[in-house]
């Protein structure tokens, strides 16, 4: 008996077999809805922001230095 999972979008049952063209989704519609959610940033992968202010020190120029020749 094949494994059955729920479609992440509509919760319909999906058999996890090679013939399931859209797995883990039940249909192309649900697959495209999920793609749209990623594209519109409704889904994001959490990443710890690592801001290193020293990495930008080389770009810190005094305004007077900017226009010197």
UniProtKB/Swiss-Prot annotation:
Cofactor-binding details, from the entry: Binds 1 zinc ion.
Keyword Cytoplasm in record: no
Entry annotated with the keyword Transit peptide: no
InterPro entries reported for this sequence: DNA_gyrase_inhibitor_YacG, Znf_NHR/GATA
Pfam families per the UniProt record, alphabetical: YacG
Alphabetical UniProt keywords: Metal-binding, Zinc
Transmembrane segments: none
Residues binding Zn(2+): 7, 10, 26, 30
MF GO annotations: DNA topoisomerase type II (double strand cut, ATP-hydrolyzing) inhibitor activity; zinc ion binding
Cofactor(s) essential for the protein: Zn(2+)
GO BP term (any one): regulation of DNA-templated transcription
Recorded superkingdom: Bacteria
Functional note: Inhibits all the catalytic activities of DNA gyrase by preventing its interaction with DNA. Acts by binding directly to the C-terminal domain of GyrB, which probably disrupts DNA binding by the gyrase.
Family named by the database record: Belongs to the DNA gyrase inhibitor YacG family.
Subunit structure: Interacts with GyrB.
UniProt protein name: DNA gyrase inhibitor YacG
Organism: Shewanella baltica (strain OS155 / ATCC BAA-1091)
């Amino acid at each position: 008996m094949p494994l059955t999972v729920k479609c992440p979008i509509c919760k319909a049952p999906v058999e996890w077999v090679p013939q399931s063209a859209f797995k883990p989704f039940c249909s192309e519609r649900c697959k495209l809805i999920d793609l749209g959610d990623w594209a519109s940033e409704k889904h994001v992968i959490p990443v710890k922001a690592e801001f290193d202010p020293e990495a930008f020190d080389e770009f810190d120029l005094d305004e007077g230095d900017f226009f010197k020749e």
